[in-house]
């Protein structure tokens, strides 16, 4: 995916960087992982389909939550993958 295919809320991106030490720009590269695992995010139900992408960025396994809006990928959050996500990725 190209960088201009992504969008996010700048305040949310700054808060995410402070909390998780992962920028949304770097996190967008999760889709470059040929083994990226994409699942529907069933934990959130605010009327908008959300997805989780689990993949490696610079050797670190991360999980991003995102949605699709008007042919763009809107990143909602990004963090290091938890143990459950690590196992799902390893077994995919």
Identify the function of each model-found stretch:
Residues 1-92:
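Ribonuclease/tRNase effector modules and their secretory precursors
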């Amino acid at each position: 995916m190209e960088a201009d295919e992504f969008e996010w809320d700048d305040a949310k991106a700054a808060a995410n960087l402070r909390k998780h030490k992962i920028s949304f720009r770097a996190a967008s590269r999760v889709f470059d992982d040929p083994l990226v695992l994409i699942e529907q995010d069933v934990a959130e139900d605010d009327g908008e389909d959300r997805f989780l992408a689990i993949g490696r960025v610079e050797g670190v396994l991360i999980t991003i939550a995102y949605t699709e809006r008007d042919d763009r990928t809107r990143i909602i959050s990004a963090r290091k993958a938890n143990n459950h996500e690590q196992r799902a990725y390893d077994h995919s």
